[in-house]
Amino acid sequence: MATSLQAAATFLQPAKIAASPSRNVHLRSNQTVGKSFGLDSSQARLTCSLHSDLKDFAGKCSDAAKIAGFALATSALVVSGAGAEGAPKRLTYDEIQSKTYMEVKGTGTANQCPTIDGGSETFSFKAGKYTGKKFCFEPTSFTVKADSVSKNAPPDFQNTKLMTRLTYTLDEIEGPFEVGSDGSVKFKEEDGIDYAAVTVQLPGGERVPFLFTVKQLEASGKPESFSGKFLVPSYRGSSFLDPKGRGGSTGYDNAVALPAGGRGDEEELSKENVKNTAASVGEITLKITKSKPETGEVIGVFESLQPSDTDLGAKVPKDVKIQGVWYGQIE
């Protein structure tokens, strides 16, 4: 960038005119030219100072270049400063509730699940039927199973880059929670903000959209490891229209007239024309790492495996592995 600005400044430097000893160039109008412009030959004398005009113009360009450079440097400092701040401190549920909107806005706290202050590292709830409330699932990593960048390497889960905003946490999930006499637990999801649209990018540049969800989850097992399956809805609804106006419940049936058969591409055309909004299935494993019976709070970690978007049946879904932390209240 500095080289480009220097070249531009060099190009805009005033040219030296050796033909005239003075810096002013006097242009005398011709009688014919003067009449055509409505000027008298005796009074039509135009004087311009090329040197001073070009000098002023070059000075303005130089000032503009300095301002642009300062703006770029300031932007770099702001970006580096924002990255240096990192994730905010994880707060307890009561601490989050005590903050105002302006204290939470722009800090990243709204996308975090609460934590527990104190408590026990074992699950200390008595046997019985409870109600699970305020369940929160916060992903900390997204990996996608795809072909490796290196040759002759089998497909494996690869780290990704998040392309969407910090709005991927599931919250306010509730449902019946049961503790058996043998210490086992069972949870069934019934309501809450139980899905979030997320897009990640693979190292090769491919972007993978999917719905992070725990809809209709039914998990059971021991507190240190209880798992279950859940429903993964279609990323797009049946009324969504593709760029050619085709949809599941509305729009055109085909892109252009009726496709001719017998060419061996019927299946490919069918995938593009016949939109499939059927839901798929995912699986999640949860672990309780700390509990606090006096407040009814539990926290833990989870690992979920679910399919990605299929573009309404036109693409083969990829396996998405999501790891993170979770929080809940048991009453």
UniProtKB/Swiss-Prot annotation:
SUPFAM superfamilies per record: OMPA-like (SSF56925)
Annotated organelle transit peptide span: 1-57, 58-84
Sorted UniProt keywords: Chloroplast, Manganese, Membrane, Photosynthesis, Photosystem II, Plastid, Thylakoid, Transit peptide
Superkingdom, taxonomy of origin: Eukaryota
GO CC entries: chloroplast; chloroplast stroma; chloroplast thylakoid; chloroplast thylakoid membrane; cytosol; photosystem II oxygen evolving complex; plastoglobule; thylakoid
Entry-linked Pfam families: MSP
UniProt-listed InterPro entries: OMP/PagP_b-brl, PsbO
Membrane-related topology note: Peripheral membrane protein
GO biological process, alphabetically ordered: photoinhibition; photosynthesis, light reaction; photosystem II assembly; photosystem II stabilization
Keyword Ligase: no
Location of the protein in the cell: Plastid, Chloroplast thylakoid membrane
GO function terms (MF aspect): mRNA binding; oxygen evolving activity; poly(U) RNA binding
Free-text function comment from the UniProt entry: Stabilizes the manganese cluster which is the primary site of water splitting. Regulates dephosphorylation and turnover of the PSII reaction center D1 protein.
Family: Belongs to the PsbO family.
Protein name: Oxygen-evolving enhancer protein 1-2, chloroplastic
Species name: Arabidopsis thaliana (Mouse-ear cress)
